[in-house]
Amino acid sequence: MRKLYCVLLLSAFEFTYMINFGRGQNYWEHPYQKSGVYHPINEHREHPKEYEYPLHQEHTYQQEDSGEDENTLQHAYPIDHEGAEPAPQEQNLFSSIEIVERSNYMGNPWTEYMAKYDIEEVHGSGIRVDLGEDAEVAGTQYRLPSGKCPVFGKGIIIENSNTTFLKPVATGNQDLKDGGFAFPPTNPLISPMTLNGMRDFYKNNEYVKNLDELTLCSRHAGNMNPDNDKNSNYKYPAVYDYNDKKCHILYIAAQENNGPRYCNKDQSKRNSMFCFRPAKDKLFENYTYLSKNVVDNWEEVCPRKNLENAKFGLWVDGNCEDIPHVNEFSANDLFECNKLVFELSASDQPKQYEQHLTDYEKIKEGFKNKNASMIKSAFLPTGAFKADRYKSHGKGYNWGNYNRETQKCEIFNVKPTCLINNSSYIATTALSHPIEVEHNFPCSLYKDEIKKEIERESKRIKLNDNDDEGNKKIIAPRIFISDDKDSLKCPCDPEMVSNSTCRFFVCKCVERRAEVTSNNEVVVKEEYKDEYADIPEHKPTYDNMKIIIASSAAVAVLATILMVYLYKRKGNAEKYDKMDQPQHYGKSTSRNDEMLDPEASFWGEEKRASHTTPVLMEKPYY
């Protein structure tokens, strides 16, 4: 058996070697598969080093070879379709012994930096109203908040009321409008709980005790088992108050309820449904709205501070350009602009309502008669979980640029891919804090990326090895802006960018191969579309690499199976001896026993409900 194992293993490795290295296959053949398909290039991604193009194949252009005039230089020089267009040398802005070629790869140096502003990806749910997930409790489906990022400055306004939403819900004989959204008092107190109280409560929990205050608050709220259902995935949302460092668990997950059929703004009718809506208000500056899914590394992957001296833009072949189509509103300051962006941001609020939904008087009658079927739709239209279970998945007008000079707020729904350095602007998002600002613009980003790309290419073409004439070859990336104009390797004199706090220079004499359309889409220009037909994949050996990876994985699996088989045969006796010791098997590693489990009787004989929270809306009577 062991001989068979060795034979199979050697055969497998031989097979893998032939796929990867054998039969003289050249993996860099045909890097551009030309076609007539027109591809957008919004999604530029940096390729791993092993997938990058050899940007220097056949042609070399030295200084003495350039004899064209200025008008010819932008279009008429030969283009190496293997990946490089030579940069003209008349201006002699770099060493005469250097041969500079321009890469054809339109990479984006902002990719990593801007990842946290891809809100659809990093948050994945509504912002203004977050009801992006469903969970079952006692056989019934309910909607609940699910955003992965904190929403800074978000709170709930109860219309025509002085009651704050962080006040506990009405209980016992209290009128509905006497209560808010938070959990009622408990013994021991679980909400609100101070940061120090949570630290002490979870001091022996390795999974929770070292979390930051926002994530800790989210996990604390998530430890509550609704309706005594330990198998439910439903988790309550929470609000953390930075001012007093308290975590408030929200008993009501609904965030908006408007319209005469669903609520009553008349304060004199104390026991009628109150109207409410989400907002970023001055009163909520220190609040942060949290779902059960807030990631523990949110500080790295989610936006918090607004960006001073910055304007969101789109990366277009070597430079960051303005977003052409925006919605412009007046705003006196950054707070008002951030508030406007929030109001227009992604929302999971239902868009259609059931025709047969009863008005609030009938819902009130349901409270009076303790008829759960009449009141289960309270606090949001029934359509939210029957006729219309809308989920935005984070798509919306989530970004804005605030112009401090004109006091205009420019709001848009296209994912920004770079930042423009402009002293008049502040870039903001619907998730960001209403007033907190990051002051440090990454001025060295372009220079650092240019250096990194040149070094990366030099390793491939052995830049340090001089040719016969003592010349060096440099493959310059398609980055035409930098705070170091010498790093641009520009064939003309770079121009200084106005309103730039970084003193950026831009090279304008190299032909740009992409443009922005009127609908905010970045596309390759018509004359270059054949060369970039593979965009956004843009990996010449992508299909081959998939085959190689799959075959290598298959070989590894085969080898593992054989090794496990031999090991099992050798250790059969010991295995069965161990199986006689039940204490080694089936030991749970879960921490359900550590989760808070409030008794159902805590809420009284009747409980509250809505389609966003699994507990009935009937007021608890103590």
From Swiss-Prot:
Annotated signal peptide: 1-24
Name of the gene this protein is made from: AMA-1
This protein's name: Apical membrane antigen 1
Cytoplasmic-side positions: 568-622
SUPFAM superfamilies: Apical membrane antigen 1
Entries under Gene3D superfamilies matching the protein: 6.10.250.430, Apical membrane antigen 1, Hepatocyte Growth Factor
Subcellular location: Membrane
Extracellular domain ranges by topology: 25-546
Residue numbers spanned by region Disordered: 578-603
